[in-house]
Amino acid sequence: MNSIAHSTLAAASPTIRHDWTREEAAAIYHAPFADLMFRAQTIHRQTFDPNQVQCNQLLNVKTGGCAEDCGYCSQSAHHDTALPASKLMEPAKVIEAAKAARDAGATRYCMGAAWRSPKERDMAPVIEMVKGVKALGMEACMTLGMLTDDQAKQLADAGLDYYNHNIDTSEEFYASVVKSRSFGDRLDTLEKVQDAGIKVCCGGILGLGEKPTDRVEMLRTLANLPQHPESVPINMLIPIEGTPIAKTATPVDPFEFVRTIALARIMMPKSDVRLAAGRTAMSDEMQALCFLAGANSIFIGDTLLTTPNPGDSKDRALFNRLGITPRDDLGVHAHS
């Protein structure tokens, strides 16, 4: 192990930093697997209960027809994926679905709309959704695309807890994935959200054709923000027929995926690291390694936007095998 990796992996306690170098982050990622896992688990235990996992549920409140050209996404209007576009859901139906998610064990409800950015006419029903979810005693999260300063403020005033806005991959590889917006556009919205006082949920996707360097740089970008994202979702690509990346995607080696989780935990020790999309393609053993590496959050339910998810019964069985219990930050199940 080189001296850079050794000094970081041997650190006595987790430190919040915003000055990670390329060399340092890469050295940690490529460290011997046992050393990497030991350090990630040590840091994880100093901040979180290793036997508790935070549970979220995600609902697509507006499907398809998106003006962006993200090469992996079935909801882009640029791709022929046979996914019909839908109108924005009625707030009452969203709130009803959120209550069912709460009763199933979710403490945070995430709502996604397939937009480049919301129009002003969309803000009133979106705000009603946020307020309705909050009234259930849950945390509310939304992903609506790029925001203006005023829209971020409106969401903050409504009580929105989290805003999801992934950077997907490294800045260097980004143009190979998305051409309708820039990497800087993503960072600009993150800044607006944080300035409004909303917590940030931001991560990326593995399996887009990126190199390990791109995974390291994606996490280094997030770890070097003035404030770490409070939640860092790590997705494994589920190739969708009709999307450009489905033709060129390469499967991610399970150990490389686990290394990415561990690096996120080490570089952002107080952030929730979410094992997000792609769990249907992961064995129980791979998911267990991810939890050991510092993942402490998942999405529950049968679907994530337009892709499959293991479902509550499989997750309960996995949790039982591993001795994991859902983390109940807010005591929401006192209402159930």
From Swiss-Prot:
Q: Name one GO molecular function term.
A: biotin synthase activity
Family matches, as InterPro entries = Aldolase_TIM (IPR013785), BATS_dom (IPR010722), Biotin_synth/BioAB (IPR002684), Biotin_synthase (IPR024177), Elp3/MiaA/NifB-like_rSAM (IPR006638), rSAM (IPR007197)
What pathway is this protein a component of?
A: Cofactor biosynthesis; biotin biosynthesis; biotin from 7,8-diaminononanoate: step 2/2
Query: Radical SAM core domain: which residues?
Result: 51-270
**Cofactor notes:** Binds 1 [4Fe-4S] cluster. The cluster is coordinated with 3 cysteines and an exchangeable S-adenosyl-L-methionine.
Query: What are the entry keywords?
Result: 2Fe-2S, 4Fe-4S, Biotin biosynthesis, Iron, Iron-sulfur, Metal-binding, S-adenosyl-L-methionine, Transferase
Q: What does this protein do?
A: Catalyzes the conversion of dethiobiotin (DTB) to biotin by the insertion of a sulfur atom into dethiobiotin via a radical-based mechanism.
The annotated subunit structure for this chain is: Homodimer.
What protein am I looking at? Biotin synthase
Organism source for this protein?
Rhodopseudomonas palustris (strain TIE-1)
